[in-house]
Amino acid sequence: MSLPTTSSPLTNDQEFAKPVRNGKIFENPKSFTNWGGRPGLTNIFKLVLRETSHENLPSDKKVLDSTLPVHNITADDFHSESGLFATWLGHATVLVDLEGVKFVTDPVWADRASFTSFAGPKRYRPPPMKLEDLPDLDFAVVSHDHYDHLDADAVKRITNLNPQIKWFVPLGLKKWMKNQGIGADGSNTVTELNWGESSEFVKNGKTITIWCLPAQHSGQRGLSDHNHRLWSGWAVIGENRRFYFPGDTGFCDVEFKKIGEKLGPFDLAAIPIGAYEPRWFMKSHHINPDEAVEVHKLVRARNSIGIHWGTYPMGTTEYYLEPRDKLKELMDAREDLKDTSFVTVDMGEIWEASDR
């Protein structure tokens, strides 16, 4: 039997930051000194009209198969003797087994990361695993409501395939989930948390603690719901293993340091490394590889894998393989991080934690 218990706020001396709430609107706190605000129409036009894209995404599938291989897998392939293993399913979707508890982050299988099926960012690398081939899932975490992180069809299908699943979401998303028919019957299928709150998930007598954590970002799905739903990162803490997922985020270094001090070290972090150029436009919302390496260090990750790249064209201007190449270059140069690992993996490749 598995169930989430009631949430509890952080009680340590130095608490995590809280979002600012103005009526229906959530905002990043003033302590996020790298937050530059929401890009206005002038900046959006400047991005479209003046910036040159260096993405150079190949149109030839054979080239993509070579540069970004996808290993098709099923639930039967997702196994290991390790107490922690994971596979990247594309973009920000990671399937994790932590001490026998299986969960997924930001499940997105959509062909387009958009409100419509005929426009918007079109997926150029397929998921390595069909929704129907997922193992039985215990829970899922959602970082925010942007279409490349929250796929309504996938959420509904996963719930139908896994009636026992629990969803952990930041403030404001529980109502959206209910509108999709998830938890609409009054069940405890959906647990909604604020930054610095946690919930315990119990399976076969084993307790997993799930933390909702600060992230520097925003939210929106329609024309009139900007920041009506909060954004967050997540930590999943087992008896012996720890996992961290920042979601989408700019570089809020003070909070990353707190996360590392309070909840680290992490055996695995899945850290975004893509969709970051031009910096004048993207810096507030997305870390780049340089900042991702600093996040890896600040949260005290023993191992990290790079995500949020190589899946959808996100309207940014960096070369499509630059996130991977830049990350390797940066890590090769960091003598202070030689005892840790921060790498990229192929979609469908099984990553396993080593014995400690």
From Swiss-Prot:
<keyword id="KW-0595">Phospholipid degradation</keyword>
<dbReference type="GO" id="GO:0070290">
    <property type="term" value="F:N-acylphosphatidylethanolamine-specific phospholipase D activity"/>
</dbReference>
<keyword id="KW-0378">Hydrolase</keyword>
<dbReference type="Pfam" id="PF12706">
    <property type="entry name" value="Lactamase_B_2"/>
</dbReference>
<feature type="binding site">
    <location>
        <position position="248"/>
    </location>
    <ligand>
        <name>Zn(2+) 1</name>
    </ligand>
</feature>
<keyword id="KW-1208">Phospholipid metabolism</keyword>
<feature type="binding site">
    <location>
        <position position="148"/>
    </location>
    <ligand>
        <name>Zn(2+) 2</name>
    </ligand>
</feature>
<feature type="binding site">
    <location>
        <position position="149"/>
    </location>
    <ligand>
        <name>Zn(2+) 2</name>
    </ligand>
</feature>
<dbReference type="GO" id="GO:0070291">
    <property type="term" value="P:N-acylethanolamine metabolic process"/>
</dbReference>
<comment type="similarity">
    <text>Belongs to the NAPE-PLD family.</text>
</comment>
<feature type="binding site">
    <location>
        <position position="144"/>
    </location>
    <ligand>
        <name>Zn(2+) 1</name>
    </ligand>
</feature>
<dbReference type="InterPro" id="IPR024884">
    <property type="entry name" value="NAPE-PLD"/>
</dbReference>
<feature type="binding site">
    <location>
        <position position="217"/>
    </location>
    <ligand>
        <name>Zn(2+) 1</name>
    </ligand>
</feature>
<protein>
    <recommendedName>
        <fullName>N-acyl-phosphatidylethanolamine-hydrolyzing phospholipase D 1</fullName>
        <ecNumber>3.1.4.54</ecNumber>
    </recommendedName>
</protein>
<keyword id="KW-0442">Lipid degradation</keyword>
<dbReference type="GO" id="GO:0009395">
    <property type="term" value="P:phospholipid catabolic process"/>
</dbReference>
<dbReference type="GO" id="GO:0043005">
    <property type="term" value="C:neuron projection"/>
</dbReference>
<dbReference type="GO" id="GO:0008270">
    <property type="term" value="F:zinc ion binding"/>
</dbReference>
<keyword id="KW-0479">Metal-binding</keyword>
<feature type="binding site">
    <location>
        <position position="286"/>
    </location>
    <ligand>
        <name>an N-acyl-1,2-diacyl-sn-glycero-3-phosphoethanolamine</name>
    </ligand>
</feature>
<keyword id="KW-0862">Zinc</keyword>
<dbReference type="InterPro" id="IPR001279">
    <property type="entry name" value="Metallo-B-lactamas"/>
</dbReference>
<keyword id="KW-0443">Lipid metabolism</keyword>
<dbReference type="GO" id="GO:0043025">
    <property type="term" value="C:neuronal cell body"/>
</dbReference>
<dbReference type="GO" id="GO:0005737">
    <property type="term" value="C:cytoplasm"/>
</dbReference>
<feature type="binding site">
    <location>
        <position position="248"/>
    </location>
    <ligand>
        <name>Zn(2+) 2</name>
    </ligand>
</feature>
<feature type="binding site">
    <location>
        <position position="147"/>
    </location>
    <ligand>
        <name>an N-acyl-1,2-diacyl-sn-glycero-3-phosphoethanolamine</name>
    </ligand>
</feature>
<comment type="function">
    <text>D-type phospholipase that hydrolyzes N-acyl-phosphatidylethanolamines (NAPEs) to produce bioactive N-acylethanolamines/fatty acid ethanolamides (NAEs/FAEs) and phosphatidic acid. NAEs are bioactive lipids that are involved in diverse physiological processes such as growth and lifespan.</text>
</comment>
<dbReference type="InterPro" id="IPR036866">
    <property type="entry name" value="RibonucZ/Hydroxyglut_hydro"/>
</dbReference>
<dbReference type="GO" id="GO:0070292">
    <property type="term" value="P:N-acylphosphatidylethanolamine metabolic process"/>
</dbReference>
<feature type="binding site">
    <location>
        <position position="308"/>
    </location>
    <ligand>
        <name>Zn(2+) 2</name>
    </ligand>
</feature>
<feature type="binding site">
    <location>
        <position position="146"/>
    </location>
    <ligand>
        <name>Zn(2+) 1</name>
    </ligand>
</feature>
